[in-house]
UniProtKB/Swiss-Prot annotation:
One cellular-component annotation, GO: plasma membrane
Similarity-based family: Belongs to the CobS family.
GO biological process terms held by the UniProt record: cobalamin biosynthetic process
Protein name (record): Adenosylcobinamide-GDP ribazoletransferase
Molecular-function GO terms, alphabetical: adenosylcobinamide-GDP ribazoletransferase activity; cobalamin 5'-phosphate synthase activity
Catalytic activity: alpha-ribazole + adenosylcob(III)inamide-GDP = adenosylcob(III)alamin + GMP + H(+); alpha-ribazole 5'-phosphate + adenosylcob(III)inamide-GDP = adenosylcob(III)alamin 5'-phosphate + GMP + H(+)
InterPro entries in the record: CobS (IPR003805)
Length: 265
């Protein structure tokens, strides 16, 4: 695959998943159009790594300025939220409200479409942010700032692959939602996405942490994926864009916890 093609697809993925001011490419003249998921699926973990790198730079910079690890972790997570425009956090809140507050499929989907945040969504957001900050702070304490930064980069990459694989594993829960408009990836596109994410995990975590940590990094997103597949499949009979976003949030938390539990060398 040509480097120019990879660069074009990476930019398209970053435009969709972040607020970075990137120009439209040749294949996507409309910067606000939804890109073809089958085309950019393999580039989504790469986009996640770029987004994670922004948080990692903020983390290392804050720690280099002698800020406390807790504050540095808060700033890093804040940078990630600002970079993505709380894209996945919004999906987490909507999913928590819908799955937690609805009595049947129709009501759950209606609640998820409501832009207002309810009790379940608010609690999910608070807990998710706390868990990300706490896990990052603990990683800084146990592994050092540079290894914690590496883990953050890989977590953001691998967790986005989990969201893509959810779209592949389940049918759209409704015909007119974001999950349907973004498209359902083909098996080959999903496999390419998973392989790129796995490659990033191995290439970065094995030298930085060791084989056991890399293995945990491979398993963690799958644990989050299967948990969200089971929950979403049972309660709404499929997937939505919100559930894919929630899967990314759950996956990044489980990933960071996995690295903490299996710290390697």
């Amino acid at each position: 695959m040509q480097l120019d093609r990879i660069a074009q697809d990476l930019v398209a993925a970053l435009r969709f998943y972040s607020r970075l001011p990137l120009p439209a490419g040749r294949d996507d003249p409309d910067a606000f159009a939804v890109p073809s998921l089958n085309r950019i699926a393999y580039a989504i973990p790469l986009a996640g790594a770029v987004i994670g790198l922004i948080g990692a730079v903020v983390l290392v910079g804050a720690l280099a300025l002698k800020l406390p690890a807790f504050l540095a972790s808060v700033l890093a997570v804040t940078a990630l939220v600002l970079t993505t425009g709380a894209f996945h956090e919004d999906g987490l809140a909507d999913t928590a409200d819908g799955l937690g507050g609805g009595r049947d499929k129709a009501q759950r989907l209606a609640i998820m479409r409501d832009s207002r945040i309810g009790t379940y969504g608010g609690c999910a957001l608070i807990l998710a942010l706390l868990l990300r900050v706490a896990a990052l702070e603990a990683l800084v304490a146990s592994a050092g700032m540079f290894r914690a930064a590496l883990a953050l980069v890989v977590a953001e990459a691998a967790s986005r692959a989990a969201g893509v694989l959810l779209l592949l594993a389940l049918p759209p829960a409704r015909a007119d939602g974001a999950g349907a408009s973004f498209g359902r990836p083909s098996e080959s596109a999903g496999l390419a996405c998973a392989l790129v994410a796995a490659l990033l995990v191995v290439v970065i975590l094995v030298p930085g942490f060791g084989i056991s940590t890399a293995f945990a990094g491979l398993i963690a997103p799958l644990v989050a994926l299967f948990a969200m597949m089971r929950l979403s499949g049972r309660l709404i009979g499929g997937q939505t864009g919100d559930v894919a976003g929630a899967t990314q949030q759950v996956a990044v938390i489980v990933f960071l916890l996995g690295v903490l539990i299996f710290p390697g060398r």
